[in-house]
Amino acid sequence: MADPGKGRGRSLALLQALKKSQMMDSPSQSESQSPESTPEQSTAPSTIASATPSTSGVSIGGRGRAAALMLAKMQQKPGSTTPAIFVPPSSTSAPTAGTGRGFKLLQNLQASQKASSQIASSQVTSSAQSDIKDLTEKMSETSVSAQASSVAKNKYFREVKDTPPVVKKGETGVPIEVTCNYIYLNFKENIVFEYEVKFEPDQDYKHLRFKLLNEHIEHFKEKTFDGTTLYVPHELPDAVRNLVSTNPYDQSKVNVSIIFRRTRRLSEMIHIYNVMFKCIMKDLKLIRFGRQHYNEHAAIQIPQHKLEVWPGYVTAVDEYEGGLMLTLDSTHRVLRTQTVLSLIKEVVQTEGANWKRKMTDILIGASVMTTYNKKLFRVDTIDDKMSPRSTFEKTEKGETVQISFIDYYKKNYGIEIMDWDQPLLISRDTKRMPGSDTPTDFMICLIPELCQLTGLTDDQRSNFRLMKDVATYTRITPNQRHAAFKKYIESVMKNETAKSRLAGWGLSIAPETVNLTARTLPPETLYFGDNVRVPGKPNAEWNSEVTKHSVMQAVDIMRWVLLFTQRDKQVAMDFLSTLKRNCRPMGIMVSDAELVPLANDRTDTYVLALKKCITSSVQLVVAICSTKRDDRYAAIKKVCCADNPVPSQVINARTLMNTNKIRSITQKILLQLNCKLGGTLWSISIPFKSAMIVGIDSYHDPSRRNRSVCSFVASYNQSMTLWYSKVIFQEKGQEIVDGLKCCLVDALTHYLRSNGQLPDRIIIYRDGVGDGQLKLLQQYEIPQMKICFTILGSNYQPTLTYVVVQKRINTRIFLKSRDGYDNPNPGTVVDHCITRRDWYDFLIVSQKVTQGTVTPTHYVVVYDDSGITPDQCQRLTYKMCHLYYNWPGTVRVPAPCQYAHKLSYLVGQCVHAQPSDVLVDKLFFL
């Protein structure tokens, strides 16, 4: 156990300074408060654990997080919600044991107070208050741990605010009538009863507590129980407050006491709703995989590919601007009809002695479903030294016995394992056992004969015919998706168990989805080279225009290298001639390349040739590869991005062999090359004269489990067409904000160097942040980012708008049409009713979808001191979706976010190193 007298003590130092000022403010106050002056103890749960003074004379140390959180609480007026009692250190105790920055500041504060001890009492009071203010300001400039901002809360309820919902509505655009995948939930009574459950003798094992309480299930038909706290929709009679249960393991008697604590508003209990709908899914006989539930009885067979598709639903309940709603979306899971064992046998026949290496590539990291209980497991390794004949320890009737996998499955599931010599699949998991503070590692052994693979392999994904057949059932139209919602609502209403479960909590589900009014923003005009102006189209695409007109800013390709193997020589020559033939209409000049034929297509052959031919005068390297190989691609990118920095393009020779498409493919490659060399393709009207727009996204490196790659991309010209990029490597447990601050300072410095002035306005689009991190971002990361401004000048204070981008959402929006429902056009905005209750947020459909159902993107404005209106924020966001140069149309997220995604993926998947500073002002990662 850690010494309680150790720690950094920043927050505790601040607390002690505050307490001292309070004593000075009321010198006549007795050391022990009178009962009248003590705030009334609240029945609300405490968010701060109580502390007791050390009797040994050592003052309380620690990191001081709880003390930091107490600062605001101590200043509350009597009668407000109070924390648990905090007992301060004895006045005779030794100095604080912290060693942090806050403690050093406190020491300086005490020294200054001692030197000025002769000052009048009134001056002392004001001086202490001033010192606290200075101390607070200094501490706000330090990198306080993000954990200090987190407060432990009961997972079953949340704070209910009496404030009205945050309403930020725009007006620009054409109103349209839409429906969405939200369903109103209505409740008769807004009360839940909370009870504490005690066991005598006490039971440490949480699972046993559930069993003991469930012996009296007739009294708790509708309940939520976490092992200690019981929530029920009605008050329990006195007769069921004291019960007796029987321990199923030793037949001993256990007294169960149920003690009333308080009533809660039903709107606090969002968790109860979500648990309830999980139970309703069971009532509907659906099988749970993660957060989704699937109907195995409605499985769609695709026999030609040995696949089956399970339809299902994903649900979530929350309180939105328009009230309490259920979010419902249809989903699908692809499974293989063959077992893992049959796949192993196929690989053994084709690969022979190398079967294990091939199966390792296929299985490691894949998810398999056990056929006997329909559970998912991640495969970590294959153990060919184990088989179903192997034994393991199992507890039976209090005794440990050895049992083989063959006997175990026959005894528990009635399954006869046919192949007794098959290897076992190993899945590793970590769980916290009852009564233990440290997690325990588990090794789960799986029988291949009893497992089905889920999902698709890379080979299957590259099979066009297979993917087309699968998409027939998974990419469902808006009409099909809406029909699935209606079917779900009808199933719940017709299922007596589900209906009674809802009625038990006083709930009912609306018979149809939520209808509302959305807006479609006007199309954006595009600007190309030679002052060409192209009006925007409703579908927000300009594929034909991008090759017809000159690019906005062309970079001529004068000195470049073309690598290819001898067998691809003709492909390379055809590509070169097509490139030179089609470059003039785009306004780009292309000179002859330095040709580098290679003897073979080995990875080291490409690497050696690149290192030899790349010199300081080379603008560009293009490598044509015979086949698609990830290791070769990664090696080429590692050389060109980090070791010998130069813009590079890798082309699969097969894509250039189609003579009917070589012209269009070459044109797209030429556009990419222009961007990688620092050119721009098109632009749109930007309303701000001096602004910098930033995109941030992360990628979790699969080869390094504990490391993530975060990319930072920032504009550095007025038209938002030139981009500066940096990469941060984040180790596990490391705070990313320190790296982001460095990136922001570097980007602002580059902006100053390019424009002669700093931007007046900074807009940050941050991807990869979930709902649970919004408060932390708002209270911790954003203040840290604002500190960067003073580094570039004491008077530099630009406005800051911080927008979180969420694209992995379940929201769907459907346009009402003559034929039922369609996807809404790009530019459709929803900013009310189904938006977050307590956040300034909106949804935008920014891209055109020709197959399936479009998914909008959710934007949460977590901070804004610029004063821009909701209309301006929404239109700017939609404008930025037009500037991604890898696609002649709008994309789902703002261009800087998409650029950041491309960069982090390239570095995390291939380069695994910091790209060279030579490339930071170019889109080398496209």
UniProtKB/Swiss-Prot annotation:
User: Which top-rank group of organisms is this from?
Assistant: Eukaryota
The entry's localization annotation reads: Cytoplasm
Q: What is its main location?
A: cytoplasm
| Binding sites annotated in the UniProt record for Mg(2+) | Q672, L926
- Cited SUPFAM superfamilies: PAZ domain, Ribonuclease H-like
| Record field: compositional bias (Low complexity) | 26-56
Domain Piwi: where? Answer: 620-912
Biological process terms from the Gene Ontology for this record are: cell differentiation; meiotic cell cycle; secondary piRNA processing; spermatogenesis
Q: In which tissues is it expressed?
A: Highly expressed in the larval testis, pupal ovary and adult eggs.
Instruction: Give positions of region: Disordered.
Output: 1-62
List, alphabetically, the InterPro entries matched: PAZ_dom, PAZ_dom_sf, Piwi, RNaseH-like_sf, RNaseH_sf
> Any idea where the PAZ domain is?
339-455
List the EC numbers from the record: 3.1.26.-
Cofactor(s) named in the record: Mg(2+)
Q: Where is the active site?
A: D697, E735, D767, H901
Molecular function as annotated in GO: endonuclease activity; metal ion binding; RNA binding
Q: Which GO terms describe its cellular component?
A: cytoplasm
Pfam families per the UniProt record, alphabetical: PAZ (PF02170), Piwi (PF02171)
- How is it modified post-translationally? Arginine methylation is required for the interaction with Tudor domain-containing protein Papi/TDRKH.
Keywords of the record, alphabetical order, are:
Cytoplasm, Developmental protein, Differentiation, Endonuclease, Hydrolase, Magnesium, Meiosis, Metal-binding, Methylation, Nuclease, RNA-binding, RNA-mediated gene silencing, Spermatogenesis
Q: State the family named in the UniProt similarity comment for this chain.
A: Belongs to the argonaute family. Piwi subfamily.
Task: Please give the subunit comment from the record.
Answer: Interacts (when symmetrically methylated) with Papi/TDRKH. Interacts with Vasa.
Protein's job: Endoribonuclease that plays a central role during spermatogenesis by repressing transposable elements and preventing their mobilization, which is essential for the germline integrity. Plays an essential role in meiotic differentiation of spermatocytes, germ cell differentiation and in self-renewal of spermatogonial stem cells. Its presence in oocytes suggests that it may participate in similar functions during oogenesis in females.
* UniProt name for this protein: Piwi-like protein Ago3
| Species of provenance | Bombyx mori
